[in-house]
Amino acid sequence: MNIRLEEEKDYFEVENLTREAFWNVYRPGCFEHLVIHNLRKEKCFVKDLDFVIELDGKIIANIVYAKANLRLKNGKEREVLIFGPVSVLPEYQKKGYGEKLIKFTMNRAKEMGFNEILITGNPNYYKKYGFESASKYNIFYEGVPEDSEFPCFMICILNKEKYDILGGIYSDPKCYDIDGAKLEEFDKKFPYKIKEKRAGQLQL
């Protein structure tokens, strides 16, 4: 197993594995492969945290990071880190590869001087990496009332001795926005797959 930075020659393979990992999971089809494709061209993209896992010459997992702005209570902005998508080929899921990639890159982010990582995800899963509800630190997701619980929005503080944010509002970077028509066109580059409605999807 080799954890290394993604290279330009890997782009299509990584986009395809991301598509395989997310297809019909949260909605019929998926858009995460286009997110990655678009993200690489954006200023918010953190190239030095774009890692893959290679196994026997095959890329089986990928993680990408981006920088986002947190609007502080005092009106200023603070740069924070976010990650995702985290993609693992279906046949390699639940074998610890995603966990290895997340831990490796979080340590690398700390070495690079980043201190706060914000994500949305399953709190029961991400708490093992040190993530806590962001509302505990008076940080809230844009559009969600501050007095309502949103446990899926979490923060990991990599070095609490350096933490000095008194509260703020987070919004996703525009580089994560997806245009439906562009997604349909982009999907034509990949092998045909059937979009299915499944129980448990977030969008039906």
Predicted regions and their residues:
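Active-site rim helix/loop that mediates acceptor-substrate recognition in acyltransferases
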Residues: 15, 22-70
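Conserved acetyl-CoA pyrophosphate-binding loop and the N-cap/start of the following alpha-helix
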Residues: 83, 92, 96-104, 114
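A short beta-loop-alpha structural element at the N-terminal edge
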Residues: 2-14
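Short hydrophobic/aromatic beta-strand or adjacent loop that forms the aromatic wall/cage
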Residues: 48, 149-154
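Acidic/histidine-enriched, glycine/proline-rich intrinsically disordered or flexible terminal extensions
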Residues: 160-204
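Internal, conserved structured core segments that host functional sites
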Residues: 49, 53, 84-87, 114, ...
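Conserved active-site alpha-helix within GNAT-family acetyltransferase domains
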Residues: 111-114, 121-148
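Conserved acetyl-CoA binding element of GNAT-fold acetyltransferases
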Residues: 75-90
